[in-house]
Amino acid sequence: MRKINFTWLLLVASTFIFTNSMEDMGHDMHDHGMHHHSKHSAKMHGPIGLMGDHFHRKGESMVSIRYMKMTMDQNYIGSNKVSDQDILQLANPYGMPEKLTVVPQDMDMDMVMLGAMYAPTNFITLMTMATFNFKSMDLKTYQPMMERDVVGDFTTKSSDLSRFNFSALFKIYDRDESKFHAQLGFERNMGKSDLKGQVLMPMGSFGSLVLPYGMQSSDRSSSILSALTYTKTYDEWKLGGQIKSKINAESDEWNFGDSNELNLWVQRDLNKISAWSLRLKHQHIESIEGLNKNIKAPVQTANPLNYGGQTLNLGIGINIMLPKGSIGLEAYKPISQDLNGPQMAMNWGLQAGYHLSF
């Protein structure tokens, strides 16, 4: 278990004390901020793939629903592509057979996220979200010896409520078209971590095994979420930056690795009701900590070390205002990937969502 980075806790706590002590003295700033909030435009929200990118004024609420699709294929070690035959030469760390015999071919992951925000004061916005995961992976099984011929193909699937999180956004600055806020939150992974599936064995028969880590709905862990977000508006343009982290605070046998993320984006109005966006996202994820002794199939995804790495994605999106609410769409693709491998790389991703404020 990793230690929590208390720098974030101190930052947000001090921000909370400062902003609350200034609330009664900051009416001029508040009125100025309300003036800017009243200038509704499609770029009021960041790209739909961002979370916690904006705060609300006192008494305002928002509900949202988002759908995300991500596809993965082609195995990598580091930033280099590797073939099935390359992977079949790797040792099986869990005994027999001596070499890996099952190789992932592609994977689809679908997520549905239900969210809500509410601002009890002008300086604090509360945010919560529940996430449902749907995963499907195609794999190929090879003979364990001799020519290593293909035995056959098979598919594993899983779905469940994955996680629930709750955060508070603390407004630090809101003036002259500049906005700056901090986020501190808690996330609980609630899905099952010991789901089983039918796996094609090297000898040609099917057996029921605990699915590898990447196919589980969650790791049953708890994490601390933190972020800092800054945006600046120049007439029809808007620039933004966000740094965020997710740090494991408690887990059972194992947990997915800690992550750090940097987002930089630009938005521009297309007309009075729509705006396009361009976003760069860099993410670093550590490998899995711990292990489940029942996950021991002769496949790369059964090894906790074959998770995590660094990715740089480029996304392009659009936000459109509706008579009630707004919709967003963003498609993204990796520019570079350096993965703890072997593991499958992301091919492309798509996210769509709807917001309604009241």
Model-derived regions, located:
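Repeated loop/turn-to-beta-strand initiation elements of outer-membrane beta-barrel proteins
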Residues: 61, 123-126, 175-180, 236-239, ...
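Outer-membrane pore/translocation modules
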Residues: 131-244, 301
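Transmembrane beta-strands of outer-membrane beta-barrel pores
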Residues: 67-73, 132-136, 172, 186-192, ...
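Extracellular loop and loop/strand-boundary signature of outer-membrane beta-barrel proteins
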Residues: 49-51, 98-102, 148-156, 210-216, ...
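Outer-membrane beta-barrel biogenesis signature
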Residues: 19-89, 190-194, 217
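Outer membrane beta-barrel transmembrane domains
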Residues: 76, 82-89, 93-94, 251-358
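Residues on the lipid-exposed face of transmembrane beta-strands in outer-membrane beta-barrel proteins
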Residues: 52-54, 65, 114-118, 128, ...
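Residues that define the transmembrane beta-barrel architecture of outer-membrane proteins
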Residues: 59, 108-112, 150, 158-164, ...
